[in-house]
Amino acid sequence: MKKMSKKLAAIVLLMGIGWISSIHASILHSIKSEEIITKGATHINEKLLTDKGWRNVNILKIDLADSNILLKPMESATGLERQNILQMVQDSGAVAGVNADYFDMGSSNSPSLGMLIEDGKLLHGYNSNFSSLGIKKNMATFMIDQSNLPSMEYYGINVQIKANDVLVGEAEAKNIVPTSVKRPIVLDSTYYETTSDIIAKHPTLYTLVVENGEVTYQSYSGESVSIPKEGYVILIPEADANLYYAALPIGTIVSIDENLYLNSGLTTAVANMKLGVGGSGILMKNGEAYTGDAHAVTPKADVARTVVASVKESNEILLVTVDKTSDYVGINQTELIELLQRYNVQDAMYFDGGGSTTFVARNEGELAPSLQNYPTGGEQRKVINGVGVYSASQMGNLANLKIIPTSTEAFVGEKVSFTVKGTDENNNPVPIDSNDVTYSLASGEGHFSGNILSPTKAGNILVVATCQGVEVGLEINVEEAPKGLQIEPSLLQIDENSTKTFQVYGINSKGSKVPLSGDKITWTSNQSSISVSNNTVSAQGECIGKVTAQYKGIQSEAGVVVGKATIAVDSLETNSAKWGGDTNTVTGSVCACDDPVYHGSRSLKMTYTFNPSSNKQVAYTVFDTPIPIREDARSINMWLYGKEQGHTAKIELVDSEGKTYYLKLTDSINFSGWKFVSASIPDEAVLPAKVTKFYTYANLVNEKITTSVYMDHISITRGFRNGIGIATRADYLFDPYYKESLQLPTGNQYMINIVGATRSDSMLLNSESIDAMSKKLGEGASVVVKASTKNSQLSLNGTQYTYANTYQEETYKNTKLIMIGTDSGGIRATEASAWSRAKASIENSSNVKNIMIVMSLNPLTQFSDAKEGKAFHDYLVEIKKQTGQNIFVIYAGGKEPEVRMEEGIRYIRTNGIDATTDSYQEGSFIKFKMDSDAVYYTIEKLK
């Protein structure tokens, strides 16, 4: 291909890592995006994770010195009708806009509280000499003068009526008719054609008609008149009619002087202003909090805010919104000032906030504007006016192209489709006909059909899109075949005689997920009543089955449950039970109970007393009728009503061959009230089976305790007991770092072992068990990391670190270990400062090859705040892209290990001694072996 033109540019997708150097400690992380919506106007969105939660900040950065930019007020045609900001932007042709002035929520037909000026003309406003609003309430006005200089001051305004340049009197307002008219009102044709509607409400008014600066008519009382296009009328209350009619006879040259003034005595004509929009109090002056009087609504509350601000030493202003929803925390005045200082603000003032806060802008390359923020209450409020941003330029010729792929990762034979957007030299959108776009390859191999690329060889492909002589390029990474397959969902529930759809992804060498074409996947099923074609599942009668997807020699399984996933087996409405029997230290009883009840009309209550003993104390219930467990069950569920007694709860399961299993429902009844608990059924149990007993026990009792526990609504969850790759992810199966076993290190190699809980409330380990576990964990290991707060006193040689639900970091050779507390549901909720400390440590880790982060929860699946978990993941992905480091997130929990690979980040769960059978030997740990820059791992049993 011939050499490409200078206009060819590759699209680079960026993810903001955050402003680590921020002086505001409350900001933990930032996700920032920017796009130019027209030359001179940039939309910035910044999602800030603070110690209070997330803040969603939208900023319209406007360069007033750019000749392409116009700022104008927006309102409805009548000035009284309320509209949402999106409608105002659409109707006025603006490219963006925010809400502006306050208004009377209790009235449906009233103007804004402040003045409104456009192009040197007062559209409407109250005379400050007679109004109780405006400067008398410390409510400021945002102005831009004819030299494009912005200001935010407590502007007063007066409206004077003059005859032959001699003052006759002052008008109470312009283009506003108050409920009671006590002074003259000036009305022009901006909003009214006649005075008929006004006279109908105020029948005693007199009217002077002024056209081309001359009085042309004096009306009778209550007479309606037309308002001249080149003039105005003066409505006069009956008490002042004689005075004004005498002073302003027909033929008199009349002028209306509209002047702004400040308390400093400075005055200027309205004609000197391009724009003026009222708002609330001044927020900042000279980069600091304003210390004078200022009207502010709920300054101490975290609410939605709209602000206009100027930027230090620049021609820029900012239109800023901060949202308040269930997902975003809003902001108070003190923190708002701190936020604005981040953006180098000089002066700032409030616009209306709360439910009125709205930010609308078109996206880059798009003609239609759209809502960009999340209004309080879930939908836009209709407001009285706004500030609109306009492009002064007409749509020009195409100058820039943006190419958007369905994916930047692909496999040979898979399709990638593209769309393009265009803008002119002023970054205004230019519509593009897809038929006018041609696609070609600057490097790599493949062929196009329209906008769809089919790569034919692995490697990097540089795609070039050309339209009207403008080119843009984008690189696509193509691999021959996936390293593994991922089916979503991995466990599918489907109703009988219905269909559902799988999505299958190929995992490439980077760990990225690439969607695969359904027609290229071969499916098989181990159940004749379940079939899959082109990723669509069809199911007939109730059953469970496994389906296998095959693609280019790679395969993966998914589970299908046809019919209900959870089935009630005994709600204990008729099944009775008896106490298991007293001992020297344990006494109790079992009875039916009608309160509390979770389901139906009764539950079973077991009351028991544990007396002090160093031996295990056990209380149990024997069901009169054993509870049947179906062949397709994978877990047994029950609702328990606890009293925070802290005892372990188990059930006894007897399989069809008579073998007994003791399955743990909960390690500790550390809850009060009803809670859903569940026990997985071991793979080796032969079903069908039956539940015969319910147990609670304590391994050690220091003080006598009498308590009770209630049982209700026993159910099963249908599925697969061997859940590897189905109930739990097993991405290690295609991970090149994973080995089935690891030899002990030699030479400069070293090993790090990481284990979950080594202590369990349900399990009393003797010294032999602890010694055996210590030996297993310590064998060949330079470092042992205990990734749980539940630990036995292990006898370990060498270096050991213990997760303590607080921030810690250690470096061993070329591996950095970072422990972050997450026990309260996430990093922020547990120890907010750990965010900045972890980021600072990670970004100063150029001397290590491996970063291992230990926490108690998987950020992507277990954080209470899913956005926080995703943000942490995205941050790690960006670090990996920049540095190429190996990054692992290891967390403790579950009854079995799990490995997830997400965009090159490995999330590994270690269950420690926790296992379905409650035998520590069935537990496991993660063994890592470092060999120079290479790292390998395996999952090893504790036995």
Question: Language-model features: where?
Answer:
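Gly/Ser/Thr/Pro-rich low-complexity, intrinsically disordered segments
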Residues: 22-566, 572
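Extracellular carbohydrate-recognition regions
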Residues: 561-588, 720-740
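Short carbohydrate-recognition loop motifs
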Residues: 594-618
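Divalent metal-dependent phosphoesterase catalytic cores across multiple superfamilies
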Residues: 724-805, 867-885
